[in-house]
């Protein structure tokens, strides 16, 4: 069965044919990127989703923002919510190679953890270096600070 989808308002360098949602839907559907989609996925990096028509709009955020259910039919977010239109999908979930996506020139997926490596006992490894920077929303000095790190 064919399913037409599209993505708008995602981060720079987002690849519509190489992401969690595309690969997930491709396991059950013949997925096609289309300007008149059945499902429009949108994030919070722009506001062009408001001008797009689609049978269904699905909001995704990895930011500390709650979905506006007046604008979307369904949402994937970090939020614990009792709303049946919201599915909790923390950002870390997208960093696992659930679909065994091969390495490609367009996107280096070598940093992803293959699903098979998550099964069985964990092997301890000595960590050499670690850096963590957590922030919510891209305002103020946060983005320039992140770029300096």
Please provide the spans of the model-predicted regions:
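Nucleotide-sugar donor-binding catalytic core of glycosyltransferases
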Residues: 1-149
């Amino acid at each position: 069965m064919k399913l037409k989808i599209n993505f708008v308002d995602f981060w720079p360098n987002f690849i519509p044919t190489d992401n969690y949602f595309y690969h997930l839907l491709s396991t059950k559907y013949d997925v096609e990127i289309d300007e008149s989609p059945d499902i429009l996925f949108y994030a919070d990096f722009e506001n062009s989703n408001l001008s797009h028509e689609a049978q269904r709009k699905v909001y995704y955020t990895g930011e500390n923002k709650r979905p506006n259910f007046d604008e979307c039919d369904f949402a994937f977010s970090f939020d614990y919510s009792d709303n049946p239109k919201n599915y909790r999908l923390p950002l870390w979930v997208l960093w696992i190679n659930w679909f065994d996506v091969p390495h490609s020139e367009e996107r280096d997926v070598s940093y992803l953890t293959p699903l098979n490596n998550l099964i069985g006992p964990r092997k301890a490894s000595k960590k050499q270096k670690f850096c963590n920077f957590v922030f919510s929303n891209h305002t103020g000095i946060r983005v320039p600070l992140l770029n300096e790190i």
